[in-house]
Every structure is written in C-alpha cells, then in structure tokens.
Amino acid sequence: MMELMDVIRKRRSVRSFRSDPIPDHVLLEILEAGQLSPSGGNGQNRYFGVVKDERIKEELAKAAGNQEWIATAPVVIAYCTSIDVDLKDLPKDNFGLVVNKDRFGEDFLDYMNQYPDRRAVKKLWNNANPLIPGQHIFLAAVNHGLSGCWIGHLDTDRAGEILN
C-alpha cells in the first residue's frame, strides 16, 4: 500500500486503458472507499453502478458526447445520486437549506424555488452528493495501480435511462 500523499501525487486522468480485467476483490475495495466517504448531513443518498457490459459502456460513451474512451475502459463506475429532494419541499429550518441560505443568500434560494423546471433544480441541489465518494474511489483505484477519468460532459437523463 502507498502512503496517502503518494497516492494523491500519482493520480492522473487517464483515457486509454489496458484490457486486463479488474479482480473482483480489488473492485470491491475501491467501491468500499466510496461507501466510507462522508455525505452532507449524513444523507448517504449516493450509490454506484459498476458497468462491465460492452453495449452499456458504448451507450454511456454516446451519452457523454461520443467520448469513445469510455467504452474502452474495463469497468465504468457510475456515481449516482437520488434527486428526489426538492428544496421547495424542505422545511425552513432544514439544516441543508439553512447552510445554503448562508452560503448563497436568500435571494438565490428564492430564485431557485420559483424556477419552473423542478428536475433541473433537483439536479443542481443534489449534484455534489457523488463527488466526494468519487474522489475516494479514484484514490483507492490509484492505490491499486489503476486510474480513470471523470466524465464532465454527460447527458445525465440519458445516462440514467441507460443504467436503469
């Protein structure tokens, strides 16, 4: 095992992969790192999808603006979150709402509450939930001599359809 700072220094975005399969015990440890990460308000409203199926990886590559490297990865780990929570439905004393009112200001939250596309608001509100576990997953992968790349451009609605 590497020291933490060595793992951090070695982490890189990689878009070309060996075809070697990732052993299940390694994959399970990488996923455990994501599960052990903190979540805002201990919401734990994130989950991970492990994709090995070639057809599904190809569909995800298309949903990501035809980034073909995605389809060549031996495994794609999808970082997912529930978007059931709508800030419009939260009580005024909800801790997350109070924190974000302090962070962004009441005018911003009022604007978000009036925004007609509630699905877009929910996506924005819950967007960060899988990011911390995602970084834990990346660092655990590096510790096993693996790497990958964040997918920044992604049609999340289409990806959700593919993964379901």
Please place each PLM-identified region on the residue numbering.
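Acidic, surface-exposed loops and disordered segments
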Residues: 1-164
